[in-house]
Amino acid sequence: MTPKNKPNFQKQPSFVPNYLFGFVVFVIFSNGFCNSDIQKGYKLTLAVPAEYSLGFIGRAFLIETDQTAPNFRAAVSVEAVNGKFSCSLEVLLGDVKVWNSGHYSRFYVSEKCVLELTKDGDLRLKGPNDRVGWLSGTSRQGVERLQILRTGNLVLVDVVNRVKWQSFNFPTDVMLWGQRLNVATRLTSFRGNSTEFYSFEIQRYRIALFLHSGKLNYSYWEFKPSKNRNISFIALGSNGLGLFNDKGKKIAHIYSQRLQPLRFLSLGNRTGNLALYHYSANDRNFQASFQAINKTCDLPLGCKPCEICTFTNSCSCIGLLTKKEKDKSDCGCGEIAVGFCGRNRVEMLELEGVGSVLRDGPKMVNVSKEECASMCTSDCKCVGVLYSSAELECFFYGVVMGVKQVEKRSGLIYMVKVAKGTQRGRGKRNLKKWVLILVGVVDGLIIVLVFGGLAYYLIRRRRKKSLACDNSS
């Protein structure tokens, strides 16, 4: 087991403007720039570069709200992603992307990206040869124009301003001020190439954050109304997030920790943290007013898979790496047996004083530690278990993520499945001590370095004062 650098997690103080990474592109348009609305029959063509350029973002702004900056703007965007160019319709608050048509499924194009509000009222994104990659599905519903409201809601309306389609009905990873999300709705992080992604879900009895890995789902944060009251919907106000019942009465509230009015709620694509944001006029950016999780080790991926997040917020490998894997910068999952089972093939490595932030997985109650370990070795989908000696509970995991160091007196024991014979020659007891002692040594070294540096600074300062007194006398 080797110590790693501290996890790459920082408090989310602000959003960096997207234009820092963008480039100017040539835009052909037919009805002007940033109108108050777009009428049916409108068509805009955004040129796509011939050669791929990493970090490229090109936008043509269509309509905007008449508010003090930062205001809402709708744009057609071409973005360089995974060696291709993605075409999308998006809404921005200042320079922060708050809605995107390609959040769940990207539309890749070459040569051009076309936005069209057809004469029969359908809003479409098209590529070469009129290939349609996204549409509103509002054909022949009386749609007359596209507007963006002061709330940031992008809407298609008919001649009497009845809404036929709205972006608020298709939430992505952001919830705006004034927006309402009903029970069974969720926000999701952008998946990208990873098999892991996060979600913020509104359930009948709670709101919760989830980690999704393949077909596996685990919660890692939740907030419940008192007295087991049921939730009907949530709404974001100026001073926090409100939870409401079926009668529209507020039953719980998550308050902002700043005086400035809130503008949006966001689910972090990298960390999976949930945060409320306000706009700082002095710094000219958005800053976090509240975060659901404030400790690195309480994040599901505060450390990489098969790493332990320690008390000092550093990451340590669980161990059992081959020589080839030790030479790599990443821990990897070494000899952890994924997809294997049977007592003749696998055994359990026991880590005392180690727990997990992941919840809601399968569990068994009133079982012994030995029974807990045996059930995992017999289950090919199980790679680890968390056993509580106090509650006699056994929690089963299909991933080794969200693992963190806990107090030994908590009575928690984390066990991972390894190939049979991995512990041979060391003995189970010695191997367990080896893993935990190394975690303790890493933390101890950090503490010694901090206090040693402080002592050195104080001694140097005292010597300088003594020399100054001698010179003056």
Put a short name on every predicted segment:
Residues 2-473:
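Beta-rich ligand-binding surfaces for carbohydrates and other polyanions
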